[in-house]
Amino acid sequence: MNQIEKTGELSASRFTVRDFTELVKIGIVNSNTITAFTGMWLAFQLNGISFIQNVDVIFFTIVGSALIVAASGAFNNVIDRDIDGIMERTKNRPTMTGKISGKRALMVALVLGVVGTIMLFMTTWQAGVLGVIGVFLYVVVYSLYAKRKLVSNTVIGSFSGAVPPLIGWFAVEPTFSIVPIMLFLVMFCWQPPHFYAIAIKRKEEYAAAGIPMLPVVKGIERTKKSMFFWVILLTILPFFMFDLGIVYVILATLLNIGWLALSIYGFKMEDSIKWAKWMFVYSLNYMTILFVAMVVISIFL
């Protein structure tokens, strides 16, 4: 065993809680768990199902969703080890520094994925199947193929990112209705402008890593047009969500108008990087306010 291997093995044996949270991408785990909770909460509220009497469903849904998202993040870190070292924002991930070896990261991902999937199947089989589909789309379709091969990688990756609210809904009420469909579409349409904002800020890094992000391949102006398109789609969705009441529709519409105005301003603003930062921050606040509002407003319906 050479010195590098010894150092890597020593580091991997000492990885911390922080290393673990970075491996599973805890920020993404948290945000996706919130959307899963929202889907679950709305299923309880809108279908007159007791929240208190289904503590087991709540537990298995929330923890199961968090675990499969964490597994997906860990799988992604294992897959991207060959390019993470090139990018500034990913070069210090524990799989790159040697704090967590590729083998150990893979084992963590497998365990999290299996346990999370079992927990989701303990609610309804539909929730379990959706969990499996979400992991497959993110790990296999997106991480292994689309991310490195297709300019449409962000849109393709948005399918998996829109699955958690469906899991939450179907864990409680395993039938289709307009609400879970709209939750899926909100998440699906929100992701391209959110991640394109990151791609604009990190354009040079993505180019160096050979990742065909839209700003790299088609340019920033083309990316701005695409972001504008997805925000327009978002402005339509509240009008199909009157089940959540007029207050929600008005709030969502105001948020959409604000984002639409910021998107339009991007065509006039010369500093595209600064504008992308504004779009990124707005997207985070948008999603937080929107999903918290869904939960709070539904209490009074």
Swiss-Prot record:
<comment type="similarity">
    <text>Belongs to the UbiA prenyltransferase family. Protoheme IX farnesyltransferase subfamily.</text>
</comment>
<feature type="transmembrane region" description="Helical">
    <location>
        <begin position="20"/>
        <end position="42"/>
    </location>
</feature>
<dbReference type="Pfam" id="PF01040">
    <property type="entry name" value="UbiA"/>
</dbReference>
<feature type="transmembrane region" description="Helical">
    <location>
        <begin position="280"/>
        <end position="300"/>
    </location>
</feature>
<feature type="transmembrane region" description="Helical">
    <location>
        <begin position="55"/>
        <end position="75"/>
    </location>
</feature>
<keyword id="KW-0472">Membrane</keyword>
<dbReference type="GO" id="GO:0005886">
    <property type="term" value="C:plasma membrane"/>
</dbReference>
<keyword id="KW-0808">Transferase</keyword>
<dbReference type="InterPro" id="IPR030470">
    <property type="entry name" value="UbiA_prenylTrfase_CS"/>
</dbReference>
<feature type="transmembrane region" description="Helical">
    <location>
        <begin position="249"/>
        <end position="269"/>
    </location>
</feature>
<feature type="transmembrane region" description="Helical">
    <location>
        <begin position="105"/>
        <end position="125"/>
    </location>
</feature>
<comment type="function">
    <text>Converts heme B (protoheme IX) to heme O by substitution of the vinyl group on carbon 2 of heme B porphyrin ring with a hydroxyethyl farnesyl side group.</text>
</comment>
<protein>
    <recommendedName>
        <fullName>Protoheme IX farnesyltransferase</fullName>
        <ecNumber>2.5.1.141</ecNumber>
    </recommendedName>
</protein>
<dbReference type="InterPro" id="IPR000537">
    <property type="entry name" value="UbiA_prenyltransferase"/>
</dbReference>
<keyword id="KW-1133">Transmembrane helix</keyword>
<feature type="transmembrane region" description="Helical">
    <location>
        <begin position="227"/>
        <end position="247"/>
    </location>
</feature>
<comment type="subunit">
    <text>Interacts with CtaA.</text>
</comment>
<dbReference type="InterPro" id="IPR044878">
    <property type="entry name" value="UbiA_sf"/>
</dbReference>
<keyword id="KW-0812">Transmembrane</keyword>
<keyword id="KW-0350">Heme biosynthesis</keyword>
<feature type="transmembrane region" description="Helical">
    <location>
        <begin position="126"/>
        <end position="146"/>
    </location>
</feature>
<feature type="transmembrane region" description="Helical">
    <location>
        <begin position="176"/>
        <end position="198"/>
    </location>
</feature>
<keyword id="KW-1003">Cell membrane</keyword>
<feature type="transmembrane region" description="Helical">
    <location>
        <begin position="150"/>
        <end position="172"/>
    </location>
</feature>
<dbReference type="GO" id="GO:0048034">
    <property type="term" value="P:heme O biosynthetic process"/>
</dbReference>
<dbReference type="InterPro" id="IPR006369">
    <property type="entry name" value="Protohaem_IX_farnesylTrfase"/>
</dbReference>
<dbReference type="GO" id="GO:0008495">
    <property type="term" value="F:protoheme IX farnesyltransferase activity"/>
</dbReference>
<comment type="pathway">
    <text>Porphyrin-containing compound metabolism; heme O biosynthesis; heme O from protoheme: step 1/1.</text>
</comment>
